[in-house]
Amino acid sequence: MSVHKSIKRITASEIQAKKKQEPIVSLTAYQAYSARIADPHCDFLLVGDSVGMIVHGFDTTLPVDVDMMILHGKAVMRGSQRALVVVDMPFGSYEKSPEQAFSNASRILADTGCGAVKLEGGIHMAKTIDFLCKRGIPVMSHIGLTPQAVNHFGGFKTQGRDKSDWEKIEADAAAIEDAGAFAVVVEAVVEPLAVKLTEKLSIPTIGIGASNQCDGQILVMEDMLGYGAWAPKFVRRYGTLEQAMDTAIRNYAEDVKSRAFPSDSEIYKLK
């Protein structure tokens, strides 16, 4: 008689405990199949609002709503067993008030079964982070370049280059730490600042275009796999997904047109 051994899923507190330990590995995931493949290798999977751009073809993340995040969050939960699943709170779902944030965050956790939510912002979101954490919702924060504020930044620009910007990001990091966030994504900031934040904060820093000295790293899975003609400077291509897909589909199309597919071994015949 075989005994099924369930796999224990990583928790937010376990991610927090990895501060200054072995680097934390994370990727975005939007579908069950990609979550299944990434799950054995990642400490957490982020169901990012970047799903709007990668999967749904939007120009920015701004059109993404809570229903879309829940749909993809459910898929990633079904596809994964081990990694903590963190779901982004989309633009407009948490900024109005802590109560609004709690209503949407609690719905995301209840409907998807995920282990945490992520929201963008520093000092101005500290009250909301505190409100959520005190009510049992684990929160990952996101500072530096925050894609939901892309219009405010005037595009996707490196952060922390001047003194005032540097000091603001430092203040943001301190505020979200004090508010109870269990980790913080640090995106597209100058490397010395990322190193300083990692040294000063008691919670893990998850770098994306920051520094290899951060407590962990995250990339958009499709960028890392080589999907798309362009990727940000901070992306290392570990595969050639788009090229492989193009080759496979082209070969399929040629076989269909030449009637080479399906072959006798791929069809059903009367015995």
UniProtKB/Swiss-Prot annotation:
The keyword Nuclease does not apply. Pathway: Cofactor biosynthesis; (R)-pantothenate biosynthesis; (R)-pantoate from 3-methyl-2-oxobutanoate: step 1/2. Its cofactor is Mg(2+). The keyword DNA-binding does not apply. 3-methyl-2-oxobutanoate binds at D49, S50, D88, K118. One of its GO terms (cellular component) is cytoplasm. Binds 1 Mg(2+) ion per subunit. Mg(2+) binds at D49, D88, E120. It is an enzyme of class 2 (transferase). GO terms for biological process: pantothenate biosynthetic process. Keywords: Cytoplasm, Magnesium, Metal-binding, Pantothenate biosynthesis, Transferase. It is found in: Cytoplasm. CDD domains: KPHMT-like. It catalyses: 3-methyl-2-oxobutanoate + (6R)-5,10-methylene-5,6,7,8-tetrahydrofolate + H2O = 2-dehydropantoate + (6S)-5,6,7,8-tetrahydrofolate. The active site is at E187 (proton acceptor). Its EC number is 2.1.2.11. GO terms for molecular function: 3-methyl-2-oxobutanoate hydroxymethyltransferase activity; magnesium ion binding. NCBIfam families: panB, PRK00311.1. Belongs to the PanB family. Catalyzes the reversible reaction in which hydroxymethyl group from 5,10-methylenetetrahydrofolate is transferred onto alpha-ketoisovalerate to form ketopantoate. Homodecamer; pentamer of dimers. This is 3-methyl-2-oxobutanoate hydroxymethyltransferase. It comes from Bartonella bacilliformis (strain ATCC 35685 / KC583 / Herrer 020/F12,63).
